[in-house]
Amino acid sequence: MPSRRACGAPDPKGRTMEQYKQEFIEFMVESDVLKFGEFTLKSGRTSPFFMNAGAYVTGDQLHRLGIYYARAIHDAFGLDFDVVFGPAYKGIPLSVVTTMAMHELYGKEARYCSNRKEAKDHGDAGILLGSPLKNGDRVVMVEDVTTSGKSIEETYPIITSQADIEVKGLMVSLNRMEVGRGGTMAALDEVRERYGFPTAAIVDMEEVTAHLHGRKVRGRVVIDDGIKAALDAYYERYGAVKEA
């Protein structure tokens, strides 16, 4: 039966989180990308946490970010793809650093691609940046976080209109694990159901909460009992239904 599980509850399957995922969670905190407190989201919800991928700004941060994406893509989708596509704007650097990391880690020679918000009518005219898409291309899409699926709704028709391609999957850095526009499913699950391709995240908020509760990062406890209670209350109200 479907049930709502409090964020950070033990994994019912008893799985152990991979080391790189634990490192990624702390990396987000250290980079001031993932913050805890009280934040008003675009949706109007008051959230006890906020993620801003725009805070990755240094060479080291971007290099490490690409490594984490590449490892997660390898684990979730394998290496049977040709292009890493990142929707404008935040997806542009994500696609670049992930493509570079794929080559560094696995010797994988993928191409990067992104879209422009407005088509260019001079020079390298068109709607795409980076590599053009070709018939038969297998594409992995990368985003920072999917809260409503709106960016996929905008970009999926663009890339599928350029050539006869296959989307192998969508990878995001964080699965917020809260209901999307449909009202019961997580946004990532809604994207998968609507478009028919796999979706995955480097980590989800259940893993984040379990790892950070009571743990010090940079000398301070990131999720204390008060923040944990706020997270549990938030997911009791907005948490997506998961299979037990």
Language-model regions, residue ranges each:
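Cationic, amphipathic, low-complexity alpha-helical segments enriched
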Residues: 1-9
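PRPP-associated nucleotide enzymes
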Residues: 3, 13-142, 147-244
